[in-house]
């Protein structure tokens, strides 16, 4: 099995329960075909570099998985048919870091800075 990071950009109108349901559907595909979810991160609501389908902001989700080609095809089909997902990207990696991603580290720093000035 190869290692991949899957980054999803999801419509901003979705609630946290709908986002959880979406990620559960994807992780069930992974586990049903003997893949493994190694890491899951919710990067929060972020501004897009440019408008995508009239959206200026969206939810970002990252799934680090161990999967074969069959699982990738199943995930790609599911993502393609899901209207809630604006964009997705599979990235093949050599190893998956167990530490918090830099995006989350920067986000928590910004939130702390905002809380201090309030």
Curated annotation (Swiss-Prot):
CDD domains: bS6. One of its GO terms (biological process) is translation. One of its GO terms (cellular component) is cytosolic small ribosomal subunit. Keywords: Ribonucleoprotein, Ribosomal protein, RNA-binding, rRNA-binding. Pfam families: Ribosomal_S6. GO terms for molecular function: small ribosomal subunit rRNA binding; structural constituent of ribosome. The keyword rRNA processing does not apply. PANTHER family: MITOCHONDRIAL 28S RIBOSOMAL PROTEIN S6, SMALL RIBOSOMAL SUBUNIT PROTEIN BS6M. Belongs to the bacterial ribosomal protein bS6 family. NCBIfam families: S6. Binds together with bS18 to 16S ribosomal RNA. This is Small ribosomal subunit protein bS6. It comes from Orientia tsutsugamushi (strain Boryong). The gene is rpsF.
